[in-house]
């Protein structure tokens, strides 16, 4: 097992795969959840990120939380046609990376991230360069621990990995 890191735990999701949508629904039923409005990110990204951070810091005092921009296919199509596919994806990734950085500054040390590009943006924003690979949480998805200070317990996945309770299982594995 990996060394414990302490600190709060959060799930950040930018994936809109079928598996991730089921995971978002399962996590939302058990824990506080904040849906990031993509249109709001385009109108005032800094304000939107600030609102998410205020909400999350308060909620994370009592429980893990979920912050997501995941949406069903028809909503994703609408967002992409309105803002452009690449631009919409980039804005979501930048926002989630900024949220991760803000949460890390507030003491969060356990991050579960859904979405390949989102995961890359978060790991980069947190300055993670080297990882210790820990036990498997789900096929193809291990728990990891960053080197350096502060240390982060991390799990990230591309969209269709894991069962419906993956987020809760991953948070438990990262304790």
Indicate residue ranges for each PLM-predicted region.
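Active-site catalytic microenvironments in core metabolic enzymes, especially phosphate/sugar-handling
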Residues: 1-175
């Amino acid at each position: 097992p990996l060394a414990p890191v302490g600190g709060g735990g959060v799930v950040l999701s930018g994936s809109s795969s079928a598996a991730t949508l089921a995971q978002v629904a399962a996590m939302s039923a058990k824990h506080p959840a904040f849906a990031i409005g993509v249109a709001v990110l385009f109108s005032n990204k800094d304000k939107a990120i600030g609102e998410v951070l205020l909400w999350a810091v308060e909620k994370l005092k009592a429980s893990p939380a979920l912050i997501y921009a995941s949406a069903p296919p028809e909503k994703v199509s609408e967002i992409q046609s309105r803002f452009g596919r690449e631009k919409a994806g980039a804005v979501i990734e930048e926002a989630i990376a900024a949220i991760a950085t803000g949460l890390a500054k507030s003491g969060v040390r356990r991050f579960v991230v859904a979405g390949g590009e989102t995961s890359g943006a978060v790991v980069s924003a947190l300055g993670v360069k080297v990882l210790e690979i820990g036990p498997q949480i789900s096929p193809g998805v291990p728990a990891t621990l960053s080197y350096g200070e502060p240390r982060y317990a991390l799990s990230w996945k591309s969209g269709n990995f894991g069962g419906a309770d993956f987020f809760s299982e991953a948070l438990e594995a990262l304790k």
